[in-house]
Structure formats: structure tokens, C-alpha cells
Amino acid sequence: MGTIVKNVSIVTGQAEAPFIRHGYFKFADGVIVSVAEGTPSPEEIDRVEVIDGKGKWVMPGMINTHGHLGMSLLRGHSDDLPLQSWLTEKMWPFEGKMDREAVHHARQLAMAEMIKSGTTTFLEMYHLYMDDLAEAVVEQGPRAVLMRSMIGLCSESEQREKLKEAVTFATTWNGDGNGRITTMMAPHAPYTCPPSFIEMIVDEADRIDLPLHTHMAETQREVEEHRKTYGVHPLVHFEQLGFLKDRHWLLAHCVHLGEEELDILEQHPSVHVSHNPMSNLKLGSGIANVQSMLERGINICLGTDSVASNNHLDLVEEMRIAALLQKGAVLDPTAIPAETAIAMATKNGAKALRLPQVGTIEAGKRADFIMIDPQCLHLQPHEHVMSHLVYALKGADVQDVFVEGAPLMLNKELKTFDEEKLQFEANAHYQRICEKLK
């Protein structure tokens, strides 16, 4: 048995055959069995479910490698402020009033939004009610990399309690949901975690064999303050303290890196960078030197950050902005070609999240894919599929989304979420929290 998807153009992500103009693929029990050009034979379609793509484009599900879904009620809550003021004056006071119900509905809203624009895997770095999110992921079908993030601006006993919570969460949920949930360890940032606390977290990550995630060099201010306190750039400090060696890290942002810091990243192939261009632009943080990182062989993937600083979770738009921004920043139209941008949104993210089972469409990989109907004005003429996916596509063009071969959206209709209820609950809980702040 199984399912065959026929009459489709396939962006495989494979180096040897990145694009199949007219082809088909088969999956069974959540795994891709075969990918081929042409039309399946009568023998191949005997006793299997057949999905006629009718000319749709298929690509790997997109992978959002940095986000805070729990902040999704904060969309538009505060704009046009520097990062530190934005965090301390607007974000953290609101989050301090959020209860379990508010965080739950924020995440429901975020997961649905991501699925509707083609994201099949997301990373959540947050500190509140993480078990609730893991349960929702198991029930509602996406793939997720989850972590209980830790801020260390507290006593050592409080740090140890946070670390205990993070380890318990990580070890409890890693591999759950038929493998759809994996976990990481996450010191929030060098400016919120003293080196002694990060060392404790790194040691625990080593003990339980999990990768690590943190914010790094997002703003010039945090880099300058770290230099005043410790005498060096935070990434250099990580290197000096031995945090990077032989460890799998995913660093979010990396906007303010000089040649020394780029050299360090190049020397550590297990350290990856999540590029969040739209959040960095909106918060005035700057433009990461992604082109130089790519030229050095550093693995770059994409993240949206939270809707509080973006203000959406559309990786299609993030992919386009990432490509265009580097072309303008380095004055080179060849920077980040379409194929590279697609890789950043798919297989590079899989590598960064230590998920070798996804990111491409090929035999043996999990059946995480999306389908796009090119019958819309802004995708004509539809000859140039790779170009259109980066420079013309909109997230709303995604029609079908599958994870592990299970449909999460068909013909733009969510299968595991009540979209009308999501909108009602989001507004109700936002107003309720605002009343608490008065």
C-alpha cells in the first residue's frame, strides 16, 4: 500500500537532481519510498492511494529554526523600539501577566499560521508551559524542536532549578510523537546568562547528548556591553571558554560578527546560524553578513523570530527577503541565488536542527512536503519554478501541507485546527492580558 503523488513538478533539494519538471513520488508509513520522472505505470498505482497533483509544485516542507510561539499574542503590541527597551518595557511585562490559557492559544495561533504558509518543522525557544506545547504538537501533527529556555539573571539556586526543569522537559519529550518532537538545551543569551550558568547548561547537554541553541550577537549594544564586562566579543568568549568545541550549536541572529568571529564559526562545522532577517530589520539590529558566512562554508538556515518582532511567521517571505537583502548589502546580484535560498529554508535547517530525516524529497526521508498551485497571476509564466519559489511566491499560495505523510492542510483548509476559533481566542486573551496591565 501507500500513496503516490503524480502529475507534479518536484523541487527535491538533492544535489544531483534538484528539480524534476514532471514526475511523481510514493510514500508509505510516513516515509518517501521513491521519486521519479514521468508518469507512474498501471502496476505502480495498483492498490495504492493516488493524489493527482494536476500540475502543482512540490517542495520539502520549510523549517523555521528560531521562534517564540508563546509570544504570538504580542503581534503589533509594540513597534519601533530598540531591542533592549522593547524587551524590558513592553515584552517582558506582558509576558509576566500571561497564564497557561493565554500561552496555549498564542501557540495554537502560531502553529496554524506556520502550517498555512508551508512550514512543517519549527523550533520553539521559550520558558512557559512547554509540556502543554509538546502535547499539542503530538496531537496536531507538525514536527517541532522544543526547549525550555533559561535566563540566568538570578541566584545560583534558581539557576539550578531552571536547569533541572529544562533537563526534565528535554529528556521526557525527546523522540515523542513518533519522532516528530526533538529537544535541545537553550541558554537564552550571553547577556542574560553568566558564563558559569552557560557552563552548567553545556555540561548537562553533553551528559544527555543534546544540541544547544542561544541568541548570539543580535545587537551592537549587547556586543559592546559584553566587551566592557569580559573584554571580548561574546562568540570569542564562548570559544575561549571551550563551549563550542565538538558541540552542536545553533546560534540565532549573529548580526554583529567581525573577521575573528567568522573565523571561529568556520573552524567549528557543528556550529550553525539561524538567520532572521526581518526581525533584525524591524528591531534595527542590522544586517547579518550571511554572504561571507556562506562563502566560508558555514551552514545558514532561516528563522522568523516571534511575531512580536517580525510580524508574521511566513518563511516564504523570509526566504525572499534573505536573498534580496544580501544582494543589496554586498552590491552583488549573484549573492544567495534562488537555489541557495531554498536550501536555507529547507535542508540547511534540517542540518542545523540535527534532523537528517527531513529537508529533501528523496527515498528514505520522512514525507514532509508542501504543494503549491501555480495557477495564479504572479506565478506566470510558470516555466521558472525555482525562481518563482523565491522571488514571486507568497505564503498564501501554499495549498497542501503534509508531515509524516499525514495532511495538515488540504486545499488551504487546516485539518487539525479550527481557524475561526483560533482568531476568536487570540483576541479574547490579548484583551484580557491588556486589562491586567492597566
Curated annotation (Swiss-Prot):
Q: Which Pfam families match?
A: Amidohydro_1
Q: Where does Zn(2+) bind?
A: 66, 68, 215, 305
* Cofactor requirements of the protein: Zn(2+)
| EC top class named in words | hydrolase
InterPro entries xrefs? Amidohydro-rel, Deaminase_MtaD/DadD, Metal-dep_hydrolase_composite, Metal_Hydrolase, MTA/SAH_deaminase
Gene Ontology MF annotations: 5'-methylthioadenosine deaminase activity; metal ion binding; S-adenosylhomocysteine deaminase activity
The alphabetized UniProt keywords are: Hydrolase, Metal-binding, Zinc
Tell me which residues bind substrate: 95, 148, 188, 218, 305
Statement: the UniProt record of this protein carries the keyword Transcription: no
What is the reaction catalyzed? S-adenosyl-L-homocysteine + H2O + H(+) = S-inosyl-L-homocysteine + NH4(+); S-methyl-5'-thioadenosine + H2O + H(+) = S-methyl-5'-thioinosine + NH4(+)
Q: How is the cofactor bound?
A: Binds 1 zinc ion per subunit.
What top-level branch of life does the organism fall under? Bacteria
Q: Which EC numbers does the record give?
A: 3.5.4.28, 3.5.4.31
Tell me its family: Belongs to the metallo-dependent hydrolases superfamily. MTA/SAH deaminase family.
Q: Which HAMAP family match?
A: MTA_SAH_deamin
**Role noted for this protein:** Catalyzes the deamination of 5-methylthioadenosine and S-adenosyl-L-homocysteine into 5-methylthioinosine and S-inosyl-L-homocysteine, respectively. Is also able to deaminate adenosine.
Name this polypeptide is given? 5-methylthioadenosine/S-adenosylhomocysteine deaminase
